[in-house]
Amino acid sequence: MNVYYEKDADLAYLQGKKIAVLGYGSQGHAHSLNLHESGLNVRVGLRPESASCAKAREAGLEVTSVAEATKWADIVMVLLPDQNQKAVYEAEIAPNLEPGNTLAFGHGFNIHYKQIVPASSVNVIMIAPKSPGHLVRRTYTEGNGVPCLIAVHQDPTGEAKQQALAWAKALGGTKAGVIETNFKNETETDLFGEQAVLCGGSAELIKAGFETLVEAGYPEELAYFECMHELKLIVDLYYEGGLSRMNYSVSDTAEYGGMTRGPRLITPAVKAEMKKILEEVQDGRFAKEFIDECNGGYQNLSKLRESNSNHAIEKVGAKLRNMMSWLIKK
């Protein structure tokens, strides 16, 4: 894969351009402020009733409606929730785009699954920092940055890749490294990781471990500590140095037990189910299911949220976290 750094990106491809960032959430605030402080001409596009309008203005940014920001801009970055992007695009973005404009995204979902199909006269790019927005912002203010992905979907002007690299540089990303990919690979790996490992797999593993201990007669408090609370300690070791760092850092007892018992849990049958989940991402079945869920008023998701919130691990966890001074907001 191609990896780019400071010397490979030139802010000149954005200087003199009018840039609209649509959304001011986790990523939106980081993109807006980092580009603004990199000397670029940035406006934020929001719904007039959005509570984020005041926050953006307090940060020194100019705020207008989504339609006005798009009409004004040469480059439009869409950082709205996936499920909202299609409707906003059709109503407020598409009518205000002109040939030669650039449409940018932080995630490939709507382009890859053809929920949004821009005119062929418009550049379509992606700049995706591989961290939460607060870390994108913090590392920038410290003079550093986080690794980013870039991709080009359409390039009628011949400058799409250079614009994506310049954007990543303005975020601070070229100080860490910018990896070139495509919308398909970014979208499919992102969704699979969320479903099979990060959000789906890990949550179910935690609940199953907690339930196993409680059903065997152990106190809920101990089950919580062993199956939920201490997970952060292990994940931090993975994050800092991979599997080897974790195995080096834990006791020999933990290392041996994990290496000999772990494969009994994550069996070939589990991996086969992972492949099925990946296939549903690849062929669009998950995307269709999620879009239908959103259009239907989140009925299934609402039930799942309620079930999760009522799980015993949530109740004992809330009680135990009150004992942890570092978690109590002052």
From Swiss-Prot:
Keyword Transferase attributed: no
Give residues annotated as binding NADP(+). Y24, G25, S26, Q27, R47, S50, S52, D82, Q83, N84, Q85, G133
Q: Which reactions are catalysed by this chain?
A: (2R)-2,3-dihydroxy-3-methylbutanoate + NADP(+) = (2S)-2-acetolactate + NADPH + H(+); (2R,3R)-2,3-dihydroxy-3-methylpentanoate + NADP(+) = (S)-2-ethyl-2-hydroxy-3-oxobutanoate + NADPH + H(+)
Q: Which family does it belong to?
A: Belongs to the ketol-acid reductoisomerase family.
Primary enzyme class: oxidoreductase
UniProt keyword Amino-acid biosynthesis present: yes
Annotated KARI C-terminal knotted domain ranges read 182-327
What does the Swiss-Prot or TrEMBL cofactor note state? Binds 2 magnesium ions per subunit.
What name goes with this protein?
Ketol-acid reductoisomerase (NADP(+))
Q: Which GO terms describe its biological process?
A: isoleucine biosynthetic process; L-valine biosynthetic process
Record function comment: Involved in the biosynthesis of branched-chain amino acids (BCAA). Catalyzes an alkyl-migration followed by a ketol-acid reduction of (S)-2-acetolactate (S2AL) to yield (R)-2,3-dihydroxy-isovalerate. In the isomerase reaction, S2AL is rearranged via a Mg-dependent methyl migration to produce 3-hydroxy-3-methyl-2-ketobutyrate (HMKB). In the reductase reaction, this 2-ketoacid undergoes a metal-dependent reduction by NADPH to yield (R)-2,3-dihydroxy-isovalerate.
Active-site residue list: H107
Cysteine pairs forming cystine bridges in this chain are: none
The residues listed in the UniProt record as binding Mg(2+) 2, with positions renumbered to this chain, are D190, E226, E230
Task: Tell me the cofactors it needs.
Answer: Mg(2+)
Pfam families, A to Z: KARI_C, KARI_N
Locate the residues binding Mg(2+) 1: D190, E194
The record's annotation in InterPro entries points to:
6-PGluconate_DH-like_C_sf (IPR008927), KARI (IPR013023), KARI_C (IPR000506), KARI_N (IPR013116), KARI_prok (IPR014359), NAD(P)-bd_dom_sf (IPR036291)
Give the keywords, sorted. Amino-acid biosynthesis, Branched-chain amino acid biosynthesis, Magnesium, Metal-binding, NADP, Oxidoreductase
Cellular-component GO terms for this entry: cytosol
Q: Which residues bind substrate?
A: S251
